[in-house]
């Protein structure tokens, strides 16, 4: 099971309650005792992460940083996820999606990246999207790729 540490110092933006993140991570159904840190960031922080780690001057909704090391309690530290609250909330409006559904999708999408799923080609994209939909259906969330 994946446990999460949520770090949120953002004010004035909608961010789901920690319990939602826990539910989404539980639905991934990862069997090993593990942990992911989710940090809610500002647009400036996300732009900085993109410049530093991807060489791109842009704001993305999420970035996933796989790690996979054991801590002292023999819990696997899978990695970190940065989530830009303002970008996620704005995109929910642009794409006419429910905010909580958008957060669920992007959290699950990011966790799957940390677990090794990719969308670097059509075959991998289909595999990843199917896995996302299998999880999102547990929450009655419609296909996020249909606009």
Model regions: which residues?
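An acidic/histidine-cluster motif and surrounding catalytic segment
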Residues: 1-104, 114-147
């Amino acid at each position: 099971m994946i446990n999460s540490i949520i770090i949120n110092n953002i004010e004035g933006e909608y961010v789901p309650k920690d319990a939602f993140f826990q539910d989404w991570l539980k639905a991934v159904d990862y069997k090993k005792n593990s942990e992911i840190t989710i940090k809610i960031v500002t647009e400036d922080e996300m732009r900085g992460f993109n410049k530093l780690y991807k060489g791109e001057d842009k704001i993305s909704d999420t970035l996933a940083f796989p790690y996979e090391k054991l801590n002292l309690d023999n819990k696997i530290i899978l990695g970190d996820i940065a989530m830009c609250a303002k970008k996620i909330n704005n995109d929910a409006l642009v794409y006419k999606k429910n905010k909580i559904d958008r957060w669920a999708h992007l959290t699950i999408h990011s966790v799957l990246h940390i677990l090794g799923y990719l969308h670097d080609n059509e075959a991998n994209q289909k595999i990843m999207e199917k896995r996302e939909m299998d999880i999102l259906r547990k929450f009655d969330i419609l296909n996020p790729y249909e606009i």
